[in-house]
Amino acid sequence: MRVKLSLMRIAVVQCFNILDDARLAGDAIVERLLWAEEEGIDLTLFPESFLLGHTYDPETIRSRASVAASAIPALCERVAAIRSTLVVGAFDLADGQVFNSAIIIEAGRVVGRYSKAHPNEPGVTAGSDFPTFLRSGVRYGVNICNDANHPGPAQRIADQDARLILYPLNNMLRSETADRWREKSLANLIDRARQTGCWVASADVTGTSGNLVSYGCTAIVTPEGSVVARVPELQEGVTVYDVPPC
């Protein structure tokens, strides 16, 4: 008798920027998660630092990290009844140091976090741990944005028999810089997929914010490097894919 393998249904969300308003960001997250509940989504990925917004200003980074100390528990309360695993980015504080982290939330509880190994934001401490997690028979880990420029963090995840690497991104940049990274961001994800033999899924912000722009690089890439799903540039949206356990 042939045994049917279970699949991990993931959703990657491309969003407009929301700055310094955890309640409004929470509204956007809850709206997507309620949809995910109806669609049988196992895991929903949001962009880097989405909860309070990304920045390269050190004072703003530390301020947002301080606010996150209460914003993350508040978000957990709001999503406690939702089945889908939530992965959302925020600057956060630990032992007086600021990290750029992806927070993994299940049933209203923080079950883990990954802190960016190659932070390019001033005053942010590099993470040194590479945890993996199991959902629906698929082991996965997280890298964050600039980590995709480096093979090491992805390999640390793959070496733990992970099948999937999540990449929260935030490509909200000055227009000339955004233009340079428009193709490079996706190329990096393809490189990491081929290098590790893992599925790769990314979630990015999009649109404009002041004098900044992000085209959006929200995509799902096979271990062979084929892009099988992508949200159109400069549009909010979500794409869904079923990742096999092996």
Model-derived regions: residue spans:
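Extreme N-terminal starter segment of soluble prokaryotic enzymes
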Residues: L5-V12
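Short polar catalytic/cofactor-binding loops
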Residues: Q14-D20
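Cys-nucleophile CN-hydrolase/nitrilase-fold catalytic domain and related Cys-dependent amidase chemistry
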Residues: A22-A107, M172-C198
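Short beta->alpha transition motifs characteristic of CBS
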Residues: L52, I103, S115-H118, A219, ...
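CN hydrolase (nitrilase-like) catalytic-core segments centered on the catalytic cysteine
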Residues: S70-T85, N149-E233
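Active-site catalytic loop in hydrolytic enzyme cores
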Residues: L93-M172, A178-A187, V240, P244-P245
